[in-house]
A protein has these predicted regions:
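Alpha-helix N-cap and loop-to-helix initiation/capping positions
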Residues: 70-77, 127-131, 203-207, 306-311, ...
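Aromatic-lined substrate-binding rim segments of carbohydrate-active enzymes
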Residues: 40-113, 215-220
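Short alpha-helical segments and helix-capping/turn motifs at coil-helix boundaries
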Residues: 40-42, 74-82, 139-145, 211-217, ...
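Carbohydrate-binding surfaces of carbohydrate-active enzymes
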Residues: 129-136, 140, 150-155, 163-165, ...
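Acidic-and-aromatic substrate-binding clefts and catalytic sites of carbohydrate-active enzymes
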Residues: 32-38, 64-65, 69-74, 236-238, ...
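Active-site region of glycoside hydrolase catalytic domains
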Residues: 88-94, 101-267, 276-296, 324, ...
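N-terminal carbohydrate-binding accessory modules
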Residues: 1-54, 84
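Conserved beta-strand positions in the central sheet of alpha/beta enzyme cores
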Residues: 56, 94, 158, 328-331
């Protein structure tokens, strides 16, 4: 992508370039609808002060179109105001436009009024796409003038989320009936709860890839043209080969998985073998961007782990040493899930609280900073100062790296990023 001032953003198979120089994006997730709009500017500045250079945010469909045909972009839902503040403070932005988002929001962001309609959601069903087209038109009108090609701050768009990997339970269902999930009938068997490894074959992988391609075409038809398009690539999720960057994740304290020691403190070459493999793409063809690094986690009624700051710091060192050339925090700033006309928008069937979405993030739901904010900022300063050198460097692992297990606390864990006669050593 090229900006009016001659600036440029491009991507090769290993790293991103900003103005023709290697660049490592440090992306922090903050949900504007979960923070009072009067506080947006202060919180954006707080994110920036933490060393984050790209702000990411979800656009939750059901929060903006709670009643069919009536869109609300005012107050705490004023997406245009939020993006304008990012622009004011020179914060690059990546917008996750759905239609399905998850984010522990009711139905994953799909409006209640779509439940039971005679078509398949999250597919190329013609009737479903009519609603998607209308949604994207609305989002595009909010973002108009802020795209990179216009001299704006929006450098990227994420399409959908975890398509053919995960879903949210419908918050409404018929009495005494099992939970329905926000997926097409042919994807029910593929659906996982939370970010995880997909053990079985996807039933209709081409249908998923085609739907992603259609979503991109609809976005472009409404002028949402950006240098970077991303898609969640973990767990064999759908992507658009050679047209989007498949992004990865790493949660060290997942509340949806069995309790155990995390593998995400073990160095490996995640450029060739991404975390949560198998995946639907060849890793070496794409840069390794991590979109959901869980340095915190959302409390649930069933599991309430407390995550120390050292855990997040170790995860980031491991990811960079393993070849990550893009770091994305989910969440970097917590928030409070808003209330709608018929109740709270939280994903209560999944066991999350009605309101709190603190996520034990570096910046908490009330704007308070945690110890992780300060320890991670040191790493961010390193990446911002030396990322142009680090990004082109390959990964070198010790010969014994494949034999180390998460429970092994005695053997030194390290990796080297090197190019020619220079390099960096990463130790956890």
């Amino acid at each position: 992508g090229v900006a009016p001032d001659g600036g440029s953003i491009s991507v090769n198979s290993y790293y991103m370039e900003l103005n023709e120089s290697p660049f490592i994006p440090i992306m922090g997730e903050i949900h504007y609808t979960r923070i009072p709009n009067e506080q947006w500017e202060e919180q954006i500045l707080k994110v920036k002060s933490g060393g984050v250079n790209v702000i990411c945010t979800y656009v939750f469909w059901n929060i903006h179109e709670e009643t069919e045909g009536v869109f609300d972009w005012d107050g705490d839902k004023d997406l245009r105001k939020f993006i304008s503040l990012c622009q004011k403070h020179n914060m690059k932005t990546l917008v996750r436009i759905g239609p399905f988002c998850h984010g522990e929001i009711r139905n994953g962001g799909i409006p209640d009024w779509l439940y039971g309609r005679p078509f398949l959601i999250r597919t190329n069903d013609r009737e479903y796409l009519k609603y998607v087209d209308r949604l994207y038109a609305e989002i595009a009108s909010q973002l108009e003038g802020f795209f990179y090609k216009d001299g704006g701050c929006i450098i990227g768009i994420q399409l959908e989320n975890e398509l053919q990997h995960s879903a949210a339970p419908w918050a409404i269902r018929y009495p005494d009936q099992p939970i329905d999930y926000t997926v097409a009938d042919y994807d029910v068997q593929n659906t996982k709860f939370g970010v995880s490894v997909q053990e079985q074959d996807i039933q209709s992988p081409e249908a998923g890839n085609q739907h992603m391609k259609t979503l991109k075409e609809i976005a472009l038809s409404h002028g949402m043209e950006v240098p970077l398009y991303t898609a969640t690539g973990w767990g064999n999720a759908a992507i658009i080969p050679q047209e989007v960057i498949p992004v990865t994740a790493a949660y060290t304290y997942p509340t949806w998985a069995d309790i155990g020691m995390s593998p995400f403190y073990l160095f490996r070459d995640i450029h060739t073998t991404p975390d949560y493999s198998p995946v639907r793409y060849e890793g070496y063809r794409y840069p390794s961007f991590c979109a959901e690094m869980g340095v915190g986690i959302q409390m649930t009624y069933g599991r309430r782990p407390r995550i120390p700051a050292e855990a997040g710091e170790g995860l980031m060192v491991r990811s960079l040493g393993s070849g990550a050339n893009g770091i994305g925090y989910y969440m970097y700033h917590g928030g409070i899930t808003p209330q709608g006309k018929r109740g709270f928008f939280s994903d209560e069937p999944s066991g999350v609280p009605k309101m709190s979405y603190d996520f034990q993030a570096p910046i908490g739901e009330f704007g308070h900073t945690r110890a992780s904010y300060h320890s991670l900022r040191i790493i961010h300063h390193f990446v911002n100062d030396f990322g142009h050198l680090l990004a082109p460097m390959g990964v070198v692992l010790p010969e014994y790296s494949d034999t180390i297990t998460p429970s092994n606390t005695h053997t030194l864990r390290y990796a080297v990023r090197k190019k020619e006669n220079a390099g960096f050593v990463f130790i956890t």
